[in-house]
């Protein structure tokens, strides 16, 4: 017997019961994006490797350790996308969408990073991101955060996420702070773990989000990033905080909050949760005003965020399971008798025409009434339509409420109206 081929470690199958949950959550996210005027953009999964090296930074963990990179038959270096922003910017430049224009875009799809699989973090993961180009004020930063807050309300998880904010200033201000931070860390190398010692010279701001408690204690005495902000960044951040205060969105200023990718400047933010065990990030983003020019376009202000859907699905399942408890079908059509199958399929097609939003499944494969009602229960149907030879003969159908057990015979011509009343 041939050996079974299984999925690659960290790259998962999502089975029908799971995809129904994903579809409901994704539908909610997309509806909110549409209500703010954001448009979908669809991007390739594979890009040229230099795109990510230039955008993310050659000395980041993503580029150094986590990218799936390969050489194609032409000898070109290609990479499975580890994140979505770089590809979105590349597409905007390539198709002339950005210069002197305002764009609000969103994308969704799989991303790939070779890291240790764990709960909510996989080597193939799914991400939804939104990017805004051409607007530089704090008001659009605030809108993105308000949009995400609306998501949490729609999903029923607002009480389980909290917002952390920071400003990491201009590139020049960050360079000055970087020098001060490195000078401080050099004086305390005995406290640093090996990972922090490596980052101290390659990407020192990442030391700020070290999970090592000894390093975190040391950082209490480190120079504060806020003390190195330029005046424009300080004013921008104050404006953002004022808008969030007016909108009633609670937040914490976390001066150690930095993003793991090099292209960020000024605003950075994260929505975090403690409802999945240890604290985890649900959604994160910020401003990246220099990235478009860095990738070959003309200077264009930009801000955006990305969210890992695996972690979001886990959170909704954990704290609001009622949100995802939707049946596979609303109505199950039970048919028995030699002459009923054709009539049942004709009735089902007519009901799908008259009730396009309703999920209706017709029994196939035979079986007596008991077996067919068991199938209706398996698929979570609220209502069964029962069609036997006598109903076919007199043009009726029996409508049975599977929750209350009540049933009534209804003329087939008026059954759609009756079903709408039952389904609400």
Swiss-Prot record:
GO terms for biological process: histidyl-tRNA aminoacylation. Keywords: Aminoacyl-tRNA synthetase, ATP-binding, Cytoplasm, Ligase, Nucleotide-binding, Protein biosynthesis. Belongs to the class-II aminoacyl-tRNA synthetase family. PROSITE patterns: AA_TRNA_LIGASE_II (PS50862). Transmembrane segments: none annotated. GO terms for cellular component: cytoplasm. This is Histidine--tRNA ligase. Homodimer. InterPro entries: aa-tRNA-synth_II, aa-tRNA-synth_II/BPL/LPL, Anticodon-bd, Anticodon-bd_dom_sf, His-tRNA-ligase, HisRS-like_core, HisRS/HisZ, HisRS_anticodon. The gene is hisS. GO terms for molecular function: ATP binding; histidine-tRNA ligase activity.
């Amino acid at each position: 017997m041939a050996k079974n081929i299984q999925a690659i470690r960290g790259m998962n199958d999502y089975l029908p019961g799971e995809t129904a949950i994903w579809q409901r959550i994704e539908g909610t996210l997309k509806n909110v994006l549409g209500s703010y005027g954001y448009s979908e953009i669809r991007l390739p999964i594979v890009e040229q490797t230099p795109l990510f090296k230039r955008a993310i930074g050659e000395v980041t963990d993503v580029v150094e350790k986590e990218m799936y990179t390969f050489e194609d038959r032409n000898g070109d270096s290609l990479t499975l996308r580890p994140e979505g922003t770089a590809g979105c910017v590349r597409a905007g430049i390539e198709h002339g969408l950005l210069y002197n224009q305002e764009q609000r875009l969103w994308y969704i799809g799989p991303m790939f990073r070779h890291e240790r699989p764990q709960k909510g973090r996989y080597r193939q993961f799914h991400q939804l991101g939104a990017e805004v180009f051409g607007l530089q004020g704090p008001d659009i930063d605030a809108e993105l955060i308000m949009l995400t807050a609306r998501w949490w309300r729609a999903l029923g998880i607002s009480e389980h996420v909290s917002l952390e904010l920071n400003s990491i200033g201009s590139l020049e201000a960050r360079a000055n702070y970087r020098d001060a931070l490195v000078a401080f860390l050099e004086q305390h190398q005995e406290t640093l773990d090996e990972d922090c010692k490596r980052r101290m010279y390659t990407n020192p701001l990442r030391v700020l989000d070290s999970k090592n408690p000894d390093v975190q204690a040391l950082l209490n005495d480190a120079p504060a990033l806020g003390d190195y902000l330029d005046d424009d960044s300080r004013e921008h951040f104050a404006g953002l905080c004022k808008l969030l205060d007016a909108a009633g969105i609670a937040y914490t200023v976390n001066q150690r909050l930095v993003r793991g990718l090099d292209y960020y400047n000024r605003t950075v933010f994260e929505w975090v949760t403690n409802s999945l065990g240890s604290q985890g990030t649900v959604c994160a983003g910020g401003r990246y005003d220099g990235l478009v020019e860095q990738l070959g376009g003309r200077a264009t202000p930009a801000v955006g965020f990305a969210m890992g859907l695996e972690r979001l699905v886990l959170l909704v399942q954990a704290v609001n399971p009622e949100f995802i408890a939707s049946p596979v079908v609303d109505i199950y059509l039970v048919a028995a008798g030699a002459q009923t199958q054709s009539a049942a399929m004709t009735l089902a097609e007519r009901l799908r025409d008259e009730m396009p939003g309703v999920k209706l499944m017709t029994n196939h494969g035979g079986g007596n009434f008991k077996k067919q009602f068991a199938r209706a229960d398996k698929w979570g149907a609220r209502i069964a339509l029962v069609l036997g030879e006598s109903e076919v003969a007199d043009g009726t159908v029996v409508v049975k409420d599977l929750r209350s057990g009540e049933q009534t015979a209804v003329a087939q011509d008026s059954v759609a109206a009756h079903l709408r009343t039952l389904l609400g």
